[in-house]
Design a protein with these regions (language model features):
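Mature N-terminal segment immediately following signal peptide/propeptide cleavage
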Residues: 41-88
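Acidic/aromatic-lined carbohydrate-recognition and catalytic surfaces
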Residues: 94-207, 215-217, 226-229, 233-237, ...
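Extended acidic/polar, glycine-enriched regions
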Residues: 184-268, 717-758, 875-877
Length: 940
């Protein structure tokens, strides 16, 4: 049972924050006791892979622009999603794209209005009829906020004013205070250049008549520092009509509950007794939120001392205790987020019988363990060799017992809009799979009002994955590939050997006013070397932190057990501060035979301003015993370039590739009956490797996520400790290998080697019809549509037709024939501002559906650009028909770009369309060469 299911069963009244946290921890402990998901036989696993369940389908973020929506168009788009293999959507109301215009049927329904709620209600009912999952963003745009958030409940910040003290001044005026602001304290400090002299900071308490009064005879240059409890003033980003306003104070429980009562309860009126599957909270982007009005009181209660005299430590170095003070401030920020935002949000979702899906990272400072409050953790970002939100989310799922981890996928994919291809989709999705993701939330599906000029509405900074793309003809096939992998990567349990410790205390210690982005600071603390070293030595890992260790961690023999996961190696990346109980647990782990590695340095400090001398001595002495001297049982790697070598000497890799191929990644899951590996080539070059798997006593099979078929793997060697398999991976190619003990069919003995017929070239004289009603033309040589002025800006589908006469000798027994469209060519990678793209010139631009003798054979949209046609060819005449689709971008490039002047005058500038200078026509069609290629087949 996952925590998701368990939370659905908890129908209690809203508890207090402490009781809620206790109930949550109890739920986590119950899940740990329950252990892994129920056993599944290899036959059942294969059956599910062939026909994966609907809940493994990709979903889409459905942007409702305005929202200028109508029932007819909403239903049409939902039916299109269903036809495209998309399993559901998340409704996100965002900014308008047209002013109200009755002549065009455009009416923007104000957010939370009766008309808007009625549209939601209609979609709720219709989505259930269609079998589509519906999630709902609990607001408009992001972060949470709007006109219902008064300034007193808006996001808080610590405002600091630093003024140089003029010579012979007796006083300075207090800075102007606006609504919601309060002066906390004033300090003076001597300066040296641009820096404050650490031991010179003194509080100024003589404040009256609108000024702070200074002592006489100050020596040297000075600054005066004013600390003000303030508001960020941040407005909701990309709001719908009627959703404009301040961003919510995420560190104020009363403000959170007011928001949920006003917005959440109103939205739930659309659903009645059938709530959405989940409500969604986007990534925490409450920029500069590092304070709340009662922070000083809360800090004193939690940390045991008054922060007020030490406020300058948050902006400057005031001495040896500076980082300890910042650590305490940061820890308090995280605690307040957990208790005042995440707890009431989680409890509200439970009361409304729905799940909480959330991107739980950013600002305010969410920790990895903050995901204990989330039913469905979600990440984003395809960067698989750094600390990124997708692996952050999957690690949380692994620790807290969730089988499903989603990611916001394809954000910024191959900008500009309508430039992304099916291959781009696959390549990025594979990277998310490598990070442990198994539910893709596409970013996204733009609603388009009826009558809007092709190619319709689009989000300002994203790809589009609706039917406006001509390549939509292969969307069901792309979606099925992703669905099969999403299903398979949910089965059993993750099989990661390494646990990578996140030093929260070090991250908090490096917070400064206005810079409290937890995951980014942790990324800097972990550094650029550790994650690649783990992955490139053939291992995989999860992140964890101190609170996760306390909640779900224990030592069992030589393993650190976190939830249902057993880790054989713990890595401490450059850790300076560590809680005594954490280090004590690591000491127990090493004593029982586990492997503990520290990089760069050994921990030396107990965290916090009030850490005692005994605690400091305990950390110092324990760390020395573990990592220093001849009797050290831990391992210190000062130069992280050596980490891979050390790790290899201490842990047999799960998978290795020969030759070494850092561009190849893998993820491993295990069931009671099978070992499941997904392997992906993340590069634009083919990779031919020998893969050695740390699996014994099992037979490997190749499971094809494109077709659902299984076949015997190319086993090179079987030993008592490993299985060696040959893999030939195309550019951006992927494979699934499943190891089990079931007997494989024996290969039939070869009774003779049939002669392989010579290739047949099909690159000339195709009849090509653009669109549905155009007159066919003869293309004597294959060329891009953009080379002809008449089709340069054509976006759509063209049908290529040709008849081929095959001699009887071309199809002898034992021969497999493929229709080959040519090889892809790598192009040099270029730095990108954001997002990703594939770096490949494909021979098919961008997708093709192949028919032989009027029978659909399949589609071609990624390497290898070929398709097996053995069973549909016949001696004599054969009719080949290939429907080819390109990008909507080409049509856009031949038209004026949208003019948002009147829109901006009406509603203000709520977005800026990105990369419009890159809206240029790109090659389209079949570029060839096209051949029929025959090869000997090996059939079992």
């Amino acid at each position: 049972m996952s925590i998701t299911r368990l939370m659905r069963r908890l129908k209690t009244k809203a508890p207090s924050p402490l009781r809620s946290a206790g109930a949550l921890q109890m739920a986590v402990l119950i899940l740990v006791a329950l252990g892994p998901a129920s056993a599944q036989s290899i036959t059942e696993l294969q059956r599910g892979f062939e026909r994966p369940p609907d809940d493994a389908k990709i979903m889409m973020r459905w942007w409702w622009f305005g929202p200028a929506v109508t029932r007819a168009e909403l239903e049409r788009e939902m039916r299109l999603m269903k036809e495209g293999g998309i399993g559901g959507f998340e409704v996100q109301p965002v900014y308008p794209l047209l002013p109200d215009d009755p002549t065009r049927g455009i009416k923007n329904l104000p957010f939370l209005s009766d008309e808007f709620i009625d549209a939601l209600r209609f979609v709720s009912v219709k989505s259930r009829e269609l079998g589509l999952r519906m999630d709902l963003t609990l607001g408009s745009g992001w972060p949470f906020g709007g006109p219902y958030v008064p300034i007193s409940e808006a996001a808080g910040m610590l405002r600091t004013e630093r003024l140089k003290l003029p010579g012979n001044s007796s006083h300075l005026p207090i800075p102007n205070l606006t609504a919601g602001e309060k002066l906390l304290a004033v300090f003076r400090a001597r300066t040296q250049g641009q820096s404050i002299v650490a031991d010179s900071v003194r509080e100024l308490t003589d404040i009256h008549d609108g000024a702070v009064w200074l002592p006489e005879n100050l020596e040297g240059p000075h600054e005066v520092l004013f600390f003000i409890s303030s508001r960020t003033g941040m407005q909701v980003k990309r709001p719908a009509v009627g959703a404009e306003g301040y961003v919510l104070n995420h560190l104020d429980r009363v403000a959170t509950e007011h928001y949920l009562n006003h917005v959440g309860d109103r939205l739930m009126q659309a659903f009645g007794s059938n709530p959405p599957h989940a409500v969604f909270c986007d990534s925490l982007e409450v920029y500069n939120q590092d304070w709340t009005s009662d922070f000083l009181e809360e800090f004193k209660q939690r940390r045991g001392y008054d922060l007020k005299p030490y406020l300058p430590a948050l902006v400057a170095d005031i001495g040896p205790k500076t980082l300890d003070i910042r650590r305490d401030w940061g820890k308090t920020l995280t605690e307040l987020l957990n208790q005042r935002f995440l707890t009431p949000l989680h409890d509200w979702a439970r009361r409304n019988h729905t799940l909480l899906r959330m991107q739980d990272y950013g600002v305010p400072a969410a920790a990895l363990s903050s995901n204990a409050y989330i039913d469905l953790p979600e990440g984003e970002g395809p960067q698989w060799k750094i600390l990124r939100a997708s692996r952050w989310a999957s690690s949380a799922s692994h620790l807290y017992g969730h089988q499903v981890t989603s990611s916001e996928t394809w954000t910024w994919l191959h900008s500009p809009v309508f430039r992304a291809t099916p291959l781009d989709m696959k390549a990025e999705a594979d990277l998310h799979f490598l990070e442990g993701i198994n539910q893709l939330i596409g970013h996204g599906w733009p609603y388009t009002a009826a009558g809007v000029e092709y190619p319709g509405w689009r989000f300002y900074a994203s790809a589009v994955f609706n039917e406006k793309n001509p390549w939509w003809i292969v969307m069901p096939d792309v979606a099925l590939y992703l669905q099969r992998l999403s299903y398979l990567l949910r089965q059993g349990q993750p099989a990661n050997d390494v646990a990578l410790y996140l030093p929260n205390d070090d991250a908090w210690a490096h917070f400064t006013a206005g810079n409290t982005h937890m995951i980014e600071i942790l990324r800097d603390r972990v550094g650029p070397n550790v994650v690649p070293a783990i992955l490139e030595t053939g291992n995989d890992f999860d992140f964890f932190d101190d609170d996760a260790l306390r909640q779900v961690g224990r030592v069992d023999k030589d393993a650190l057990v976190l939830g249902a996961n057993h880790y054989r190696v713990i890595i401490l990346p450059g850790v300076e501060r560590i809680p005594p109980d954490t280090l004590q647990k690591f000491e127990e782990f090493v004593h029982n035979g586990g492997t503990l590695i520290a990089t760069r340095n050994i921990p030396q400090l107990a965290p916090g301003f009030r850490a005692t001398e005994a605690e400091q001595r305990q950390i110092h002495d324990t760390a020395l015993q573990l990592f220093a001297g001849l009797s050290a049982t831990g391992h210190l790697v000062r130069d992280e370039k050596e980490l891979g070598t050390v790790l290899n000497s201490l842990l047999k890799p799960d998978v290795t590739f020969a030759p070494a191929s850092p561009q190849i990644g893998f993820i491993h899951r295990k069931t009671s009956d099978a070992e499941i590996y997904f392997v992906a080539n993340t590069s634009n070059a083919p990779q031919n490797v020998i893969a050695s798997f740390r699996v014994q006593g099992m037979q490997p099979e190749l499971w094809d996520p494109f077709s659902g078929r299984t076949s015997r793997a190319n086993v090179r060697l079987l030993t008592e400790s490993q299985t060696v398999v040959g893999l030939a991976l195309e550019p951006y190619g992927s494979r699934v290998l499943v190891f089990s003990k079931r007997a494989l069919p024996k290969t039939s003995p070869q009774t003779g080697q049939p002669a392989v017929p010579a290739p047949i070239d099909l690159s000339t004289d195709w009849r090509v019809t653009f669109g549905d009603n155009a007159k066919p033309l003869v293309m004597d040589q294959l060329r891009s549509w953009t080379e002809n002025e008449a089709t340069k800006y054509f976006s759509g589908r063209a049908t290529y037709e040709k008849e081929v006469n095959l001699p009887a000798g071309f199809l002898p027994p034992g021969i497999t024939v493929k229709l080959d469209f040519g090889d892809a060519k790598p192009i040099p990678e270029q730095p990108l501002r954001s997002g990703m793209q594939t770096w490949l010139e494909a021979p098919v631009r961008e997708a093709a559906v192949v028919y032989i003798n009027d029978q659909r054979v399949g589609s071609v949209w990624c390497p290898p650009y070929s398709i097996d046609v053995t069973n549909v060819l016949r001696p004599g005449a054969n009719r080949i028909r290939t429907v080819v689709a390109n990008l909507a971008l080409n049509y856009m490039s031949g038209r004026p770009l949208p003019d948002y002047r009147l829109l901006n005058l009406r509603y203000g500038e709520r977005f800026q369309a990105q990369d419009m200078d890159k809206v240029l026509a790109v090659p389209a069609g079949l570029l060839g060469p096209i051949r029929l290629l025959a090869n000997r087949s090996s059939k079992p």
